[in-house]
């Protein structure tokens, strides 16, 4: 099985109409969408998702931001999707993101940086289990043999 990652388009990305653009970038790279849902997150769920950041001074503002509007939660699958997905997304601080990355092209402030992506396989597995307790879709891309050796 290929690696999986969790990607979330944050409320600013949803409100700005960037869903299609973001999905397109992952699809064009050759990754396969295995789960997708548009959800409005409540405070306890957001706090659980960001529990590892609970001691940070920005935690409360981050939770307020995530619950401020709908988000798009996704599971993406492919070879090295966690590492490559982070490269597609760009640095957490948009000012340090290269042009051509999602944050480099669409974000200005670190507090409104459009997208979240798992930072490691372990956190991806944890986030996927939290957001998709039903698991990913049981399907395989027909393009798989055209992308991978």
From Swiss-Prot:
Q: Which Pfam families match?
A: NDK
Annotated active site residues, numbered on this chain, are: 116
Q: Which Gene3D superfamilies match?
A: Nucleoside diphosphate kinase-like domain
Where does the chain bind ATP? 10, 58, 86, 92, 103, 113
Q: Which GO terms describe its biological process?
A: CTP biosynthetic process; GTP biosynthetic process; UTP biosynthetic process
Q: Which domain of life is it from?
A: Eukaryota
Q: Which reaction does it catalyse?
A: a 2'-deoxyribonucleoside 5'-diphosphate + ATP = a 2'-deoxyribonucleoside 5'-triphosphate + ADP; a ribonucleoside 5'-diphosphate + ATP = a ribonucleoside 5'-triphosphate + ADP
Which SUPFAM superfamilies does the annotation name? Nucleoside diphosphate kinase, NDK
Name its co-factor(s).
Mg(2+)
- What Enzyme Commission number(s) apply to this enzyme? 2.7.4.6
Say which enzyme class the record assigns.
transferase
By its UniProt entry, which InterPro entries does this protein fall under? Answer: NDK-like_dom, NDK-like_dom_sf, Nucleoside_diP_kinase, Nucleoside_diP_kinase_AS
Keyword vocabulary terms for this entry:
ATP-binding, Kinase, Magnesium, Metal-binding, Nucleotide metabolism, Nucleotide-binding, Phosphoprotein, Transferase
What GO molecular function terms would the record report?
Answer: ATP binding; metal ion binding; nucleoside diphosphate kinase activity
Q: Which family does it belong to?
A: Belongs to the NDK family.
Q: What does this protein do?
A: Major role in the synthesis of nucleoside triphosphates other than ATP. The ATP gamma phosphate is transferred to the NDP beta phosphate via a ping-pong mechanism, using a phosphorylated active-site intermediate.
- Its protein name is Nucleoside diphosphate kinase 1
What organism does the UniProt record list as the source?
A: Glycine max
């Amino acid at each position: 099985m290929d690696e999986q990652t969790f990607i979330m388009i944050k409320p600013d990305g949803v409100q700005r109409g960037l869903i299609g653009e973001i999905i397109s970038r992952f699809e064009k790279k050759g990754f396969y969408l295995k789960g997708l849902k548009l959800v409005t997150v409540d405070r306890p769920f957001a706090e659980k998702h960001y529990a590892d950041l609970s001691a940070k001074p920005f935690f409360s503002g981050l939770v307020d931001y995530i619950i401020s509007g709908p988000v798009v939660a996704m599971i993406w699958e492919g070879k090295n999707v966690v590492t490559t997905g982070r490269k597609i997304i760009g640095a957490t601080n948009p000012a340090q993101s290269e042009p051509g990355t999602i944050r480099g092209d669409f974000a200005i402030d670190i507090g409104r940086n459009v997208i979240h992506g798992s930072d490691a396989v372990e956190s991806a597995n944890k986030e996927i289990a939290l957001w998709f307790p039903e698991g990913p879709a049981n399907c395989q891309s027909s393009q798989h043999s055209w992308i991978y050796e």
